[in-house]
């Protein structure tokens, strides 16, 4: 039995009827090298039965205490049933990429049941006739609650449930033995001890405690405007966009793939640019084109909240969430793609420098000192207030670079070829762009809700247009002095079949 950390619990408390704190990973497999892949629900059940032991998240569930007077506990699920967690859905016989994206949206829209372990796998076989995908393609949708994993720990679990070349067969799972929950008196005592410790830490954070102030106080206390803006520009506000309004329970999702080698080559066009800067530039261009299409492009540049992993090596095995965020100016007001890349390179560098180690962990420190009952009340209040405000407060949308596998992975005989990500959105923050890499491919996935993004395919087209714009401009500009990467040929994206 393990108690949730304050940061993990926050993802539970933020949930409501329209906001669900889970992510859905979209794994696409190439089974064209197999004569009979044997891709069906029974095979997936057998495979997962042999991998349940790789992480406790597969067999434990959440136990919340009365009135949320302390943080919830992870407890073993004595009635665990694997059949509940492994499912299968199929596309229509003539289904295309748009139909597949709609299926992902539907699966992602359904909340996870807290009476069970917080994960599901959904098999989607026979994606054989979708342009741009292998002739023997299938997908697995892995839905996991954010209370259990973040991007870094999630990739560890993904690699553990897949097969890798030369990997030994996994050991069998030991029987589940439920742990005893603490009594009401024990829970009250633990909550009291925790709150006393949180009070001391809170006093320390505001400078009233006995502990010495850190050397990098200046960084930790840098106001948000300084962190989010260029060092040579006046801070600007957060524009209100069509993405910043109340969401509905029905999710929408779209994803497009690009050649990672070409993206790496684009950074040569601007001195100091990183791959992440190139990706942010492509995303910003896509958003600019889409908002122009909707006649809703703001004059003030949009801001993106970018999650960052802040766990140390010693904390790497702890699981759960240890994340913070930096906020970066996306410069959506700049039409020229190379000028936009230059501006984003400066902005991202300034944001990273100002958000030092202590500054990045400050969100985690603040969450740690808020008692469980207050967190639960605040989480409910935030959702209601944001739903009525219909406006952004800190940033316009999230852009997250999720780590990809470092080796070739297989499942049910298929080689993992591509990874997409459907991510959670909430009232006031109705856009989440996930960036994932796998097997030399970079995939840009866009998550929103149906009332905000009724035409996700159009936003996907705009991302492709932005990629082509930047690629063309980068080729015409002499490369800066750094080790070059030979551009590869652009990959074709899955497209809708013509009727």
Regions found by a protein language model. Give the residues of each.
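Soluble acyl-CoA-dependent acyltransferase catalytic core bearing the H(X)4D motif
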Residues: 1-8, 26-39, 45-429, 433-464, ...
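Acidic, low-complexity proline/glycine-rich segments
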Residues: 6-18
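TRNA-binding/sensing appendages of the translation machinery
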Residues: 18-23, 42
């Amino acid at each position: 039995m393990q108690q949730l950390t304050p940061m993990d619990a926050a993802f539970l408390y933020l949930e409501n009827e329209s906001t669900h704190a889970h992510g859905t990973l979209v794994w696409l497999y190439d089974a064209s090298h197999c004569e009979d892949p044997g891709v069906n629900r029974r095979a997936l059940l057998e495979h997962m039965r042999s991998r349940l032991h790789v992480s406790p998240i597969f067999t434990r569930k959440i136990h919340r205490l009365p009135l949320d007077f302390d943080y919830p506990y992870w407890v073993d699920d004595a009635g665990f049933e694997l059949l509940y967690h492994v499912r299968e859905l199929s596309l229509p016989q003539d289904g295309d990429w748009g139909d597949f994206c709609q299926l992902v949206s539907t699966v992602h829209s359904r909340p996870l049941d807290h009476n069970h372990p917080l994960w599901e796998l959904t098999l989607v076989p026979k994606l054989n006739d979708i342009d741009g995908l292998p002739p023997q393609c299938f997908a697995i949708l892995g839905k996991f609650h954010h209370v259990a994993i973040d991007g870094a720990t999630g990739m560890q679990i993904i690699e553990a449930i897949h097969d890798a070349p030369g990997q030994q067969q996994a050991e069998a799972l030991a029987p589940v033995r439920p742990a005893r929950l603490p009594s009401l008196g024990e829970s009250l005592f633990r909550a009291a001890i925790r709150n006393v410790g949180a009070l001391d830490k809170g006093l320390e954070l505001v400078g009233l405690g006995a502990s010495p102030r850190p050397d990098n106080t200046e960084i930790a206390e840098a106001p948000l405007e300084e962190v989010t803006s260029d060092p040579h520009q006046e801070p600007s506000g957060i524009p209100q966009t069509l993405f910043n309004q109340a969401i509905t329970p029905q999710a929408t999702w779209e994803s497009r793939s690009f050649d990672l080698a070409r993206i790496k080559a684009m950074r040569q066009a601007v001195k100091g640019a990183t791959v992440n800067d190139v990706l942010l530039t492509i995303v910003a261009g896509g958003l600019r084109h889409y908002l122009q299409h909707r006649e809703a492009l703001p004059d003030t540049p949009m801001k993106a909240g970018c999650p960052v992993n802040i766990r140390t090596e010693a904390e790497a095995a702890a699981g759960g969430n240890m994340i913070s965020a930096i906020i970066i100016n996306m410069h959506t007001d700049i039409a020229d793609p190379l000028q936009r890349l230059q501006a984003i390179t400066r902005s991202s560098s300034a944001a990273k420098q100002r958000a030092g180690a202590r500054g990045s962990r400050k969100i985690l420190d603040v969450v740690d000192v808020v008692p469980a009952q207050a967190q639960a009340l605040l989480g409910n209040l935030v959702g209601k207030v944001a739903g009525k405000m219909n406006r952004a407060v800190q940033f316009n949308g999230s852009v997250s670079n999720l780590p990809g596998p470092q080796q070739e992975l297989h499942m049910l005989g298929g080689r993992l070829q591509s990874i997409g990500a459907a991510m959670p959105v909430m009232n006031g923050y109705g856009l989440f762009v996930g960036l994932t890499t796998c097997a030399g491919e970079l995939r840009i996935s866009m998550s929103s809700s149906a009332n905000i993004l009724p035409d996700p395919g159009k936003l996907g087209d705009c991302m492709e247009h932005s990629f082509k714009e930047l690629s063309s401009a980068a080729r015409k500009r002499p490369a800066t002095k750094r080790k070059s990467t030979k551009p590869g040929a652009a990959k074709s994206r899955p497209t809708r079949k013509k009727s």
